[in-house]
Amino acid sequence: MVKSFYGYVRDAWKNPDETYVNELRWERLQVWRKQGSVTRIERPTRIDRARSLGYKAKQGIVVVRVNVRRGGLGHVRPNRGRRTQKMGKNKVSGGMSIQRIAEARADRKYPNLEVLNSYWVGEDGKHKWFEVILVDPHHPVIKSDKNLNWICDASIRGRATRGKTSAGRKGRGMSTRGKGTEKTRPSIRAHKSRGK
């Protein structure tokens, strides 16, 4: 079977450090660093990934690039007495992943749009960049699209802030079931955050 154009793009992005993507990314990051934290773009950088997540080149769909800090939660060591367990030096689990933070920021920037999904496009020593696909639930083109009109329902509002996107469901532990995930349902907080 003949491989499609999207297949070649996908293969190049699987190992971006070893393909032509590396050189392109080096040039792009120089421009992206000078842009704002949420920047609307004309078309997706990774067209294969965007289309697999539901992107279509039609009215009512917007793509933005979001710049978020890298790294875990910084935690200053307490200078008073603590149990070792409560010092939080070995590990402090963040409530949201970096990708979820990017989705939430895009959601706040465009309050009339709804987050469909997001994907990684680059990183350096300080920042990570994600592209977030946003959909206008009130646009007639979206309302008439049988694949996307589910997002027009009132119950779907605020997907990104409620952890209903792919990154959100993964962070809440909804991607696995059964043994080992007893503390993630009905929610993380219902089990005193032991599921994290």
UniProtKB/Swiss-Prot annotation:
The keyword Ribosomal protein applies. Keywords: Ribonucleoprotein, Ribosomal protein. Residues 160-172, 186-196 have a biased composition (Basic residues). It comes from the Archaea. One of its GO terms (molecular function) is RNA binding. Residues 160-196 are annotated as: Disordered. InterPro entries: Rbsml_eL15_core_dom_sf, Ribosomal_eL15, Ribosomal_eL15_arc, Ribosomal_eL15_CS, Ribosomal_uL23/eL15/eS24_sf. Gene3D superfamilies: Ribosomal protein l15e. SUPFAM superfamilies: Ribosomal proteins S24e, L23 and L15e (SSF54189). One of its GO terms (biological process) is cytoplasmic translation. One of its GO terms (cellular component) is cytosolic large ribosomal subunit. HAMAP family: Ribosomal_eL15. Belongs to the eukaryotic ribosomal protein eL15 family. This is Large ribosomal subunit protein eL15. It comes from Methanosarcina mazei (strain ATCC BAA-159 / DSM 3647 / Goe1 / Go1 / JCM 11833 / OCM 88) (Methanosarcina frisia).
